[in-house]
Amino acid sequence: IEMFTGFFDDAAEKPWGEYLKGILDLAVAVVVAISYLHYNSSEITIAITGTTIVIPPVVFAILTVILVWVSINVTNCSDGVDGLSGTLTIITLMSVFVLDNILKVNDSFNYCILLFAVCLLGYLWYNATPSKLLMGDAGSRAMGIFIASAVLKMHSPFMYLLVAAVLIADG
């Protein structure tokens, strides 16, 4: 859904306003939070200590909405024609992959992370000078939602601050 909102914004003759995009991002973040809580618990793991904490579902949903909304917008803000956003997303996803392998939390989702990273490598190949392929909002927003999903599936949502620190600083 998020990819389509970015695509339609890119394709529009008159770009959508920041408020409309923000509201659409918020709506998508709410859908992600509800979907995540439907299929997963509201349990998080503090990676450093290995402590597991159960957060009330309503609080977890609010924090998930914030995480997804921030991830979408931070990744979108770092998007440019030079492949910066794609490169930073690969670094972020590989950090999630390594940490998830160390913590042994969700091995099955790691294959999705690797697949997404390989797809981004293909994009970066064609984005190199002279650029033949541009990502636009469609790609950067999809990357943001995937990063948030990967961190959520790791059951360590606060780890986003560490693994996406460069994206946050740039965005």
Positions of predicted regions on the chain:
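"…together with the soluble PPM/PP2C metallo-phosphatase catalytic core" -> "…together
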Residues: 1-169
